[in-house]
Amino acid sequence: MGFWCRMLENQEQEEVITVRVQDPRVQNEGSWNSYVDYKIFLHTNSKAFTAKTSCVRRRYREFVWLRKQLQRNAGLVPVPELPGKSTFFGSSDEFIEKRRQGLQHFLEKVLQSVVLLSDSQLHLFLQSQLSVPEIEACVQGRSPVSVSDAILRYAMSNCGWAQEERRGSSHLAEGDQPKSCCFLPRPGRRSSPSPPPGEEKDPFEVWAPVVDSEAPPLESPTLPPTSSPSCCGFARPDEGLSASQPVRRVLGGGHAVPLDPGQLETVLEK
């Protein structure tokens, strides 16, 4: 009887999709092509996703492309709006924070639509670090790896660093957690994500992204290997979704420091 009860509970388990847009950073700070990007962390138990946990960085321009593609493929199904390009806010920091909140609201609405959720471009946008041309090549059959394989390859590329990160984890105080869902890549090493916030793990236990082998394949032929591992930044696990996210600039070696609001004027619209 207990066995059948457990089966019934599993069948009735509610699907949950959690998405967070956070940690805005100015990339290529000081150059003509500087821009702001955002970390997108996704954790789910839905069978619609190949990887149950993922972490990528995307810029506003890529969100604009994604919305156009979703609208093109969705037909009469409405696609949520993106935050506008208006700069009528009190400061540059406030503008970026408003945009971050708007981008998160956009993704939350998109992920509530069954039609939009079936678009393979959305999955590659959220669960791989492929560029826009690489995503287009993948869904159009002009690359050698399938959509699901591309997502799996990106997920598995974040499983390294086990030996290196054990030492760092052992020095954390009780209750502390690593400060990122995706570690910045180090030369010669692959990056490794941390367990989802709030989930207690043995600091010496190797954690890897959960992959659903029974997830329905996303219909699309293939793409080339990902050009680079995850570049998700260091975000504190206690950063709330509504809390203001400090803007950072990326310097040599993968470190980040707060950015003077006056330096953001040339990168807000990119």
UniProtKB/Swiss-Prot annotation:
UniProt keywords (A-Z) are: Cell membrane, Cytoplasm, Endosome, Lipid-binding, Membrane, Protein transport, Transport
Where does this polypeptide localize? Cell membrane; Endosome; Cytoplasm
Q: Where is the composition biased (Basic and acidic residues)?
A: 168-177
Region of interest called Disordered, as start-end residue ranges on this chain: 168-244, 251-270
Q: Name one GO cellular component term.
A: plasma membrane
Residues annotated as binding a 1,2-diacyl-sn-glycero-3-phospho-(1D-myo-inositol-3-phosphate): R59, K85, R99
Q: How does it sit in the membrane?
A: Peripheral membrane protein
A single GO molecular-function term is: phosphatidylinositol phosphate binding
PX domain sequence ranges:
16-132
Purpose: Phosphoinositide-binding protein involved in protein sorting and membrane trafficking in endosomes. Regulates the levels of TRPV3 by promoting its trafficking from the cell membrane to lysosome for degradation.
The record's subunit annotation is: Monomer. Interacts with TRPV3; this interaction promotes TRPV3 trafficking from the cell membrane to lysosome for degradation.
Designated name of the protein: Sorting nexin-11
Q: Which organism is it from?
A: Bos taurus
Q: Which gene encodes it?
A: SNX11
